[in-house]
Structures are given as C-alpha cells and as structure tokens.
C-alpha cells in the first residue's frame, strides 16, 4: 500500500510558484523624480560622449592631394590596345609637416557624384572603379554639361 501512495505522490505537479503561474507582478511606478533623474542622466551621458567624440576628431590630421592631371599619361598609354603589356607607374611626391601617430588611411574623392542620385546610378562605371580608363558615353554628355553649368551658377542671394 505504501508503494501505491508513493506512486500517486510522484504524479502530482510540483507546488512551485513558477509551475502554478503565480509569480509576483512587477510594475514600474513613474514618478516625476524618477523620470527627471533618467532624463538628466541620459543627457549627461550623451554630453560626455559628444565631448569625447569632438576631442578625438580634433586630433585627426588630413592631407589632400589632387592627382587629376598628374597621372594622365597612364590613362593615355592604356587607351591603345597594343600597350596592354606595358606598365605605367604614377608617383606623386608629398611631404608631411609632422609625424602622424596611429593608423593612416587613404581615401579618394569624386566631385559631383552622389550615390543616391539617379544620374549617378546611370553613370556608374565598374571599369572606372577598378582603375581602368573609360571614355565618356554619349548619353552622359548632357549630364556633365549640366553639372558644369550648375557649378558656374552663383546661387547665393
């Protein structure tokens, strides 16, 4: 008979608050003091992060070198298909005014091209991005002229 009683007890559910789904409820009570504390603490945190970012941005050094016309001979050399095996080296000497600390990154800049602009998407050339010289397509001549015209117009009032 004892075995039967133990068998019945093992089939009963555990009497825990989790299994009986009687967990206590936790509710947030918003008071003016708590809301203002969180608001000002967030503001102070954002202010500190902004100061840190501004100070780190001031320590960067930037050098801009325009190489548009310096390496034009390489593009002319590669226009002729018979020169496919000839190498063209383009070097641009420049001098640094001081020592650069940390990592050095090099970027290039394109003027008048915006990635989300419809005309930029039409004018994108993967061959040019790889570094090969490309000729101007006829359907983009009007865009280039419009761009030159807009650069010459003075929009200031």
Curated annotation (Swiss-Prot):
InterPro entries: CDC50/LEM3_fam. The keyword Ion transport does not apply. Residues 56-157 are extracellular. Glycans are attached at residue 66. The chain crosses the membrane at residues 35-55. The keyword Transmembrane helix applies. Keywords: Glycoprotein, Membrane, Transmembrane, Transmembrane helix. It is a single-pass membrane protein. One of its GO terms (biological process) is phospholipid translocation. GO terms for cellular component: endoplasmic reticulum; Golgi apparatus; plasma membrane. It is found in: Membrane. Residues 1-34 are cytoplasmic. Belongs to the CDC50/LEM3 family. This is Cell cycle control protein 50C.
């Amino acid at each position: 008979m004892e075995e039967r009683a133990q068998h019945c007890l093992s089939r009963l559910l555990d009497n825990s608050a989790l299994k009986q789904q009687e967990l206590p409820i936790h509710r947030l009570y918003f008071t003016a003091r708590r809301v203002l504390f969180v608001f000002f603490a967030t503001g102070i945190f954002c202010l500190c992060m902004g100061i840190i970012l501004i100070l780190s941005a001031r320590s960067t050094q930037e050098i801009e070198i325009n190489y548009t016309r310096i390496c034009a001979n390489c593009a002319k050399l590669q226009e002729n298909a018979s020169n496919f095996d000839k190498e063209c080296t383009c070097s641009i000497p420049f001098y640094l005014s001081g020592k650069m600390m940390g990592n050095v990154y090099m970027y290039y800049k394109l003027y008048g091209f915006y990635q989300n602009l419809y005309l930029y998407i039409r004018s994108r050339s993967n061959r040019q991005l790889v570094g090969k010289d490309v000729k101007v397509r006829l359907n983009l001549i009007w865009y280039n002229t419009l761009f030159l015209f807009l650069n010459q117009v003075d929009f200031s009032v």
